[in-house]
Amino acid sequence: MKKLVLLRHGESTWNKENRFTGWTDVDLTPKGAEEAHNSGRLLREAGFTFDIAYTSVLKRAIRTLWIVLDEMDQMWIPVESSWRLNERHYGALQGLNKLETAVAYGEEQVLIWRRSYDIRPPALTPDDPRYPGCDPRYRNLPKQDIPLTECLQDTVSRFLPYWRESIAPQVKSDKSVLITAHGNSLRALVMYLDNLSEGEIMELNIPTGIPLVYELDDGLKPIRSYYLGDQAKIEQAMQVVANQGKILPNL
């Protein structure tokens, strides 16, 4: 049996402010840092050790990984960072408050932008200061690979080749792998691993800072998956994610 652990970064400053973040490089809040520390403790106490870790090129995921590995006394393991693990690019919505956007465009439209599989939000223009082509970390990317907006399908299309070429071979060779990334890049992988439909993926909410463990067979098909931690708190954290963008959230 092979094990893979997925971890969404801890709460970021824009998670706290309920903003569409996407490729904007915001940092963790103190709560987010504590979520990362707690994830590291949970993994250590459950007996996990890792051979290699993967993360995005965005600091909220990178810092989460640093904290987790520090808690586990495993900061020495190899780490690979790739833009392909970045959060989904939210286009012109990046920086906007989700609740205010729901008031302006309607709760249903915001839900479609956030959770649908193949509908993109309004795009940035290349002269927008938020355009990632202006960021030096992407200077070696072909222009056609730099998004102006993305739907989840686009995120799947950029993530899965990296999974197949870089990550999956490590898992198949019995390496213990940790992926610290983002809500939508991890939704893309979960959709693939669990063979979820487009309708099912709309209902999937991945909370910040809680390890999701996959036990896989030799063909990397899931045997089971589960979150580490207190189940009541996990369900509450999932509901917080689900309520983002609702005009009258049921808190």
Curated annotation (Swiss-Prot):
Its EC number is 5.4.2.11. Substrate binds at residues 8-15, 21-22, 60, 87-90, 98, 114-115, 183-184. It catalyses: (2R)-2-phosphoglycerate = (2R)-3-phosphoglycerate. Pfam families: His_Phos_1 (PF00300). GO terms for molecular function: phosphoglycerate mutase activity. Transmembrane segments: none annotated. Keywords: Gluconeogenesis, Glycolysis, Isomerase. It is an enzyme of class 5 (isomerase). Gene3D superfamilies: Phosphoglycerate mutase-like (3.40.50.1240). InterPro entries: His_Pase_superF_clade-1, His_PPase_superfam, PG/BPGM_mutase_AS, Phosphogly_mut1. One of its GO terms (biological process) is gluconeogenesis. Homodimer. PANTHER family: PHOSPHOGLYCERATE MUTASE (PTHR11931). Belongs to the phosphoglycerate mutase family. BPG-dependent PGAM subfamily. This is 2,3-bisphosphoglycerate-dependent phosphoglycerate mutase 2. The lineage of its organism: Bacteria, Pseudomonadati, Pseudomonadota, Betaproteobacteria, Nitrosomonadales. The gene is gpmA2.
